[in-house]
Amino acid sequence: MSNVVDISTWINTFLKALQKTFGDRVWFVGLQGSYSRGEATETSDIDMVVILDELSAKDVEAYNRMLNTLSHRELICGFLSGKDELLKWEPADLFQFYYDTKPIQGSLDELLPLLDVTAIVRAIKISVCNIYHGCVHNMLYEKSEDILRGLYKSASFVVQTIAFWQTGNYIHLQKDLLPVVASDERQIVDTFLTLKNGGAVDFENMSEALFAWSQNWIARTNCMYVKE
């Protein structure tokens, strides 16, 4: 018998608690991650996005108290912010945030003017730089299979952004990227899916492949042209 959370019932309880705590101050509520994609398992986090009209430290404390009243508290995570901060956020960070968030209450469409080609290319570059650093650091120091799995997960999100930049379409499920992206990106996604499904880690070869891929994209993002 599956112990995956009945997310619809849980969200209804969450929304009632949120309304009781913050009333009409709630500007947006959304769901991210595996529950939003229909891929949740028993250990999946419940990634809730809550944007208030404004956010204070006291609001953070109130939200924490509210979460403590809910079931599956250990699985709850996500994003809490004030509206003004979100609208002034680094645009490169907002690309994945916008497209990975399933709206429940309100809309994030005010973010769309910020998500231009410059923001998308910058999102790719920042991410591959971080993956490059993480990969080298892990090859030298931690030598951790779990870290490598996490880096491939991050890389699969970058491939989503690359696919959007190339096609104009956001593909939510990684498996649906496979017939769309180029062979280098396909290898990254295929490795991620293999690891996600419990496949064995070939630490040296997988690390070298990820290193080379991120290195290549650092160079490519340095000379990307804006597409018409």
Regions found by a protein language model. Give the residues of each.
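Conserved nucleotidyltransferase catalytic core and NTase-mimicking acidic/glycine-rich helix/loop elements
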Residues: 107, 113-228
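Alpha-helical elements of Rossmann-like donor-binding domains used by nucleotide-donor carbohydrate transfer enzymes
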Residues: 13, 17, 96, 209-216
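Metal-dependent nucleotidyltransferase catalytic core
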Residues: 1-21, 37-43, 49-91
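Short gly/ser-rich loop at a beta-strand->alpha-helix junction or flexible surface loop bordering the NTP-binding
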Residues: 26-35
